[in-house]
UniProtKB/Swiss-Prot annotation:
Gene responsible for this protein: DIR21
Signal peptide region: 1-19
Organism: Arabidopsis thaliana
Domain of life: Eukaryota
Record function comment: Dirigent proteins impart stereoselectivity on the phenoxy radical-coupling reaction, yielding optically active lignans from two molecules of coniferyl alcohol in the biosynthesis of lignans, flavonolignans, and alkaloids and thus plays a central role in plant secondary metabolism.
Residues bearing attached sugar chains per UniProt: N72, N173
Cellular component per GO, a single term: extracellular region
GO biological process, one term: phenylpropanoid biosynthetic process
Primary location group: secreted
Record carries keyword Thylakoid: no
Protein name (database record): Dirigent protein 21
InterPro entries on file: Allene_oxi_cyc_Dirigent, Dirigent
Amino acid sequence: MASLYLLLLLPLFLALILAATITESKSFSTTVKAPYPGHKPDKLTHLHFYFHDIVSGDKPTSVQVANGPTTNSSATGFGLVAVVDDKLTVGPEITSEEVGRAQGMYASADQNKLGLLMAFNLVFTKGKFSDSTVAMYGRNPVLSKVREMPIIGGTGAFRFGRGYALAKTLVFNITSGDAVVEYNVYIWH
């Protein structure tokens, strides 16, 4: 009879221990107060500018820093890595007013189609967004008419920023490799 009570009480005892363990363990996530008082990410900002990628001449703004063993024989340049500090301007001409720089890197990361992995900080140097940055990271299928890449963060006015960037190539010089790309960036911050 005692063993019957033991068999009936054992599952109850184990359930109580399990319940106590669950309530004592740390949670994976918690809701916290905003670290910056008054910050409410409810503003949508549209930025429009032109990106000048210069790989030719005496002062290139995009420099190849690495390649793989098959980069030169690959139709997509797979393995190429470049570091950039490209000018961002108000108009499509390189002489138009500079509003910032695109600083970061891109890598040819697709063996079958021309696709770049882009990791950029858009650093703004003029206007109300001066000293603010936007972090853009994603895939750029450069032969598509319009490409979409995610905005994953920012600093300054764009702290806690999120959104997307639309890129459209205006000019690509097949001989020099230089390009002008129009960007429309939408950021919630």
